Amino acid sequence: AELFERFGLAGFERTPPAELSGGMRQRVAFLRTLIAGKPLLALDEPFAALDAITRGEMQGWLAAALEADPRTVVLVTHDVEEALYLSDRVLVLSPRPAGVVAELRGPVPRAPDRDATVTRPDFVSIRERALQALRQG
């Protein structure tokens, strides 16, 4: 019950998955993954199906969850801000065949509020470097 509360799911313990919002279904998936106790999380476009507002909220939620329960995460995403906000280290890949064209460090420390982080000058600078690397790919 305490995990449901921590994951923002209190009161929905017996709710069928089809009745949960997209963000809630994502939190259930992360809860299952964290309960498994694996030291490595592999996340492939975890927020791609969510609307922009829910995606930002879920990114902030995941950052806080990983701060509370640190794990190594391999995150695959096409969203540059998402990669930089959620990661300590970002590898920018070229088109097929994939090769590393740049390695960037995410902003540390991250503000608990995602919007406060992605508007900071250091974040904007890193984002511009990532976009430039993608363009040059």
Regions found by a protein language model. Give the residues of each.
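Helical segment within the ABC ATPase nucleotide-binding domain
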Residues: 55-70
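Conserved ABC ATPase "signature" region
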Residues: 1-12, 64
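Conserved ABC ATPase signature
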Residues: 16-20, 24
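Hydrophobic anchor residue at the start of the ABC signature
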Residues: 30
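Interfacial catalytic loop of ABC nucleotide-binding domains
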Residues: 14-16, 114
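A short, proline-enriched helix->beta-strand linker immediately N-terminal to the Walker B motif
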Residues: 35-39
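Catalytic Walker B motif of ABC-type/P-loop ATPase nucleotide-binding domains
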Residues: 41-45
